[in-house]
Amino acid sequence: MKCLIIAAGQGSRLRSLAEAKPLMPLKNIPLIDRVIDSALEAGVDDFYVVVGYNGANVRAHLEEVSRSKNIPITIIENNEWQRANGISVLKAQPYLNEPFLLLMADHIFDSEIASQLIHRSSENKGIILAVDENLQNTLVDMKDVTRVLVEENQIKKIGKGLESYNCFDTGIFLCDPVLFTAIETSSKNQQDDSLSGGVRILAKQGKAGAMPINGSFWCDIDDPDNFKQADIYLSSLIEKCA
């Protein structure tokens, strides 16, 4: 299974902790390494990473990861990284003509989530998004999280400002290449370059599924508070395993 990781953003709210957000260490392991490790555990064997802000440093790190782990990592440049995240997804279009896992470099997660998505490849018509139905999840930043309204395992609405919703977007997707066309349509017709814009197009076509994560761990490391919460959570896991 191929995997696309978006690592192009600036991460301005974490500049005090790291120059390049994907390289920020959490328990001495860079965020993007944690994402790659979880994907490997889930069965991914071919990586594509879109870099942008501070791309030279991220590229150098990924080249070392590729050598040390003996895994293929294709690095894709996005010189329009200031635009919405859908642009980063589109930069990978020439490389991906089959189903792929889509991940964010700053979203760490239990590998079981990705594994379950991969096992659902045969039923995917557009995208399947892993969603968190725990609306009281203390690791979620309510000011920034993307909200999702799901009915009968189909996405009906998605966006940060939704007033009516029943789960959260974890940033972990199983995608068919039709997603690229959907983002292009959203950009052209709605002037919306975001990944969520593409998902909305697919939702209208009945091609946007949802998979509950049923309590599995995930966290969007978006600011110092999220970072501290994730650090505490991982510390508790280490203590349990000791």
Predicted regions and their residues:
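Conserved alpha/beta core of the MobA/IspD/sugar-nucleotide pyrophosphorylase nucleotidyltransferase superfamily
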Residues: 1, 166-242
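N-terminal nucleotide-binding beta1-loop-alpha1 segment
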Residues: 1-17
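Conserved N-terminal catalytic core of the sugar/cofactor nucleotidyltransferase
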Residues: 2-5, 29-99
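Alpha-helix/helix-capping structural signal
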Residues: 9, 53, 112, 177-178, ...
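Phosphate- and divalent-cation-binding pockets in alpha/beta enzyme and binding domains
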Residues: 13, 57-60, 85, 112, ...
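Conserved beta-strand segments of alpha/beta enzyme cores
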Residues: 22, 72-74, 154, 207-209
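Conserved beta-loop-beta/alpha segment of the NTase-like Rossmann-fold superfamily
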Residues: 66-145
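Conserved core of the sugar-phosphate nucleotidyltransferase
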Residues: 110-186
